[in-house]
Amino acid sequence: MVDVGCFAQREGEIPEPGPEQALLRVLSVAIDPAIRGWLNERGSGYLPPLGLGEPVRSNGIGVVVRTTTEALPVGALVTTLTGWQEWALCCSDFSDIAKLGTVIPEGITPVEALTVHGQIATTSYVGVEVVAKPEAGETMVISAAASAVGSLVGQMARRRGALVIGIVGTEEKRSWVTDELGFEACINYRTDDIASSLLQLAPKGVDIFFDNVGGEILDTVLRRMAMHGRVILCGTLATSNSVEPYRLQHWERILSRRFSMTGFNSMDHWDRFPEATAAVTQWLADGSIKYRAHVLEGLDRAPEALVRLFLGDHLGKLVIEVADP
């Protein structure tokens, strides 16, 4: 388990941008489950693990202060993997996917960009509109339903007419997703039996499971999948701190119920970023989707925030404000 003692602050020189690069003054950084995977020796699978002494990799927002590319002009608000640092370089091409910078449209604040736009919007939008494609009347279950991605996915699925059931870990989160976001029901995995709850809430089975956590919750929902359903694998929050991988006990249901399991990453669909941003902006404006951010001030609180993420001690997207815009 990661604790705050695993991290230390260091000072370094501000880097100069190379060809097709921009220097960002970092304004905010997001605290995401993916960070934990990058801290493991084996990495996350799609980006290499971090070495000791390297800045923690993290999605962030910064303002361009120096640039060598017209695609990232001075003054632009840009999202990239800034890391836990006050200054960061990004690039305007795909020469380094981990440092690809994308300009955020005007009128969007740094916290909004990390909470409901950028990677969050693209992941949620692609997950629903391209991968899951819920249809009216289908039952869709979402784990980590009060998270930034989980809450958006649920609201987007409801817009398509799906019956949405969330899985969360506190009563406060359960109330938020049902009372404010409009989910049909929500299961508290700490107090409710997931299998029996799903039998009651979805007696004909689960058509779509959008999974952000993996582990035992994934294994349990597999038992309740409907014939020809689909499981969308988006995250492994429940097993990020595990030394040994969780071994599924109910994998045979994939065969007997003939449902599919699909893993996806928004990096494979970054060309949909403008489309996702436009859609989310419109849905925010017309009130059909809502969001919540849990903001902490100061880069020194980033380790604390990461610990809180895995304890579930927050409501909404965890964001660190590094500097004033």
Go through the PLM ranges and name each one.
Residues 79, 141, 187, 207-210:
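N-terminal Rossmann-like NAD(P) cofactor-binding module of classical short-chain dehydrogenase/reductase
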Residues 86, 169-177, 245-251:
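Short, glycine/polar-rich helix-capping loops at beta-to-alpha or helix-loop-helix junctions
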Residues 114-192:
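Mid-domain Rossmann-like dinucleotide-binding core that forms the NAD(H)/NADP(H) cofactor-binding site
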